[in-house]
Design a protein with these regions (language model features):
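Non-catalytic substrate-recognition/targeting regions of SAM-dependent transferases
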Residues: 41-51, 70-141
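Non-catalytic accessory regions of SAM-dependent methyltransferases
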Residues: 1-54, 202
Length: 226
């Protein structure tokens, strides 16, 4: 649902209103250096997700109706951000979820506009990450886990920590930066582990935070035996 008004025209002015409302809300509630700027139904733009990672936008479109408007919405968002002095250097589309096929759409992955370096560094909760918006999972990083990652910091000082399904190491790194004695992160994805190790180096944590590429369900019984 985009509006509750039956006579509301879905035009450029309407889309600009929705985008401005979404951005103004983020400015009041979250750290906007990296955040989910557009969150589908929550912003009355159903089926559309736009994540901002520093100066990069990542777009995920999951419904046919909004798919036809996505590039116009992206252009509006870039213009709105520029009013706050924010220049977007690139936009990448990650509309590669299977659910698109339910509405007869192909799975799409690629640049919207000019090509650019798809790796971007962000900082969250005092932890530095290199996000790969092209090859990472989903839109590149799980922004929705920000406060769960922060909560980990309060629990991990002087602890030994095992982070299963670590992806790019975000929970492991939050444990490490909070003073954990030793942290092991495990994931079956070689790419994810490679990125996690790079993130550990970015934060100077490679001596206390290690990453293992393995199937968690195979590894846990072995660890239990040790």
């Amino acid at each position: 649902m985009m509006t509750r008004k039956q006579d509301q025209e879905i035009d450029h002015a309407f889309l600009e209103m929705r985008v401005r409302d979404a951005w103004e809300y983020r400015k009041k509630t979250v750290d906007t250096s990296s955040c989910r700027v557009i969150f589908g139904e929550a912003d009355f733009l159903p089926g559309l997700v736009i994540d901002k990672f520093s100066d990069v936008l990542v777009v995920e479109s999951l419904a046919l109706g909004i798919d036809r408007m996505k590039e116009e919405i992206v252009d509006i968002l870039k213009a709105v951000l520029s009013e706050d002095g924010i220049t977007i250097r690139g936009v990448y589309e990650r509309s590669d979820a299977k659910v698109r096929q339910n509405e007869g759409m192909e799975r799409v992955k690629g640049f919207i506009g000019e090509e650019f370096d798809t790796k971007v560094e962000i900082v969250e909760n005092g932890v530095r990450y290199m996000v790969d918006v092209k090859d990472g999972q989903k839109t590149g990083f799980f922004l929705d886990q920000k406060y769960n990652r922060l909560a980990i910091q309060r629990l991990c000082k002087d602890a030994e920590v095992l982070d299963c399904f670590t992806h790019t190491g975000s929970f492991a790194l939050n444990a490490g930066i909070a003073g954990a004695k030793h942290v092991t992160g495990v994931d079956a994805s070689e790419l994810g582990i490679e990125q996690a190790r790079e993130n550990a180096r970015l934060n100077g944590l490679e001596d206390r935070v290690e990453f293992v590429c393995a199937d968690v369900f195979d590894l846990l019984p072995k660890l239990e035996e040790e």
